Regions:
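Alpha/propeptide regions of enzymes that mature by internal proteolysis
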Residues: 1-191
Length: 191
């Protein structure tokens, strides 16, 4: 029910993940399945998940979506996107959120290039734009859900930009759009 993705070597991570979020040196990431009515201590539960699975210094995301049914990946150039999607609680930035439901969109991007911290932040911006565009194009009146998670993982390096005018940004957008579209198709089919 879970997904664990170890790296061959430690990578620089920037995320809003509930476990080891922020700027972090990560040995991998995981998508942890939780019950749809989950209201536990996420910090304790993620630490316990890491311990039980013999992991250390992983970035952890949580979802009530059935991970084996919805996990989708797409590799475009140096960018690989891993997406789990469920959209029972669509939201629009700047509007009152709907009643919380446990489905979410998690996006983890693994980039096989050396990025500055600024480029990591730029990657999150580009990926968010791609996520929003995909949702709108598929007919969802939403910019995301109330609990979306996103993380980018790359080696530290000299690449400064990852916006939509760059080759890297174009690949980020394509990978996110492809993986998210497929994950949402799988999620809809599982309803």
């Amino acid at each position: 029910m879970h997904y664990i993705h170890p790296f061959d070597e430690e990578m620089l991570a920037l995320s809003n993940a509930p476990h080891n979020g922020g700027l972090f040196k990560a040995k991998g990431f995981f998508f942890m399945h939780v019950h749809k009515n989950y209201d536990g201590d996420y910090k304790k539960d993620c630490l316990e998940f890491e311990r039980k699975n013999g992991l250390n210094n992983f970035v952890g995301f949580m979802t009530a979506a059935e991970i084996p049914k919805v996990l989708s990946t797409a590799k475009i150039g140096s960018v690989e996107a891993y997406v789990t999607a469920g959209i029972t609680n669509p939201a629009i930035a700047g509007e009152e959120p709907p009643k919380f439901m446990s489905k979410t969109i998690n996006i983890a991007l693994v980039i096989d290039e050396g990025l500055t911290i600024g480029a990591l932040a730029n990657t999150i911006m580009t990926a968010t734009e791609a996520k929003t565009y995909t949702l709108l194009k598929l007919g969802y009146e939403a910019t995301g859900t109330t609990s979306d998670g996103m993380g980018v993982f790359a080696n530290g390096g000299e690449i400064e930009w990852a916006g939509t005018a760059t080759k890297l940004g174009i690949n980020i957008g394509k990978a996110v759009r492809k993986a998210l579209k497929e994950s949402l198709r799988k999620w809809e089919a599982s309803l």
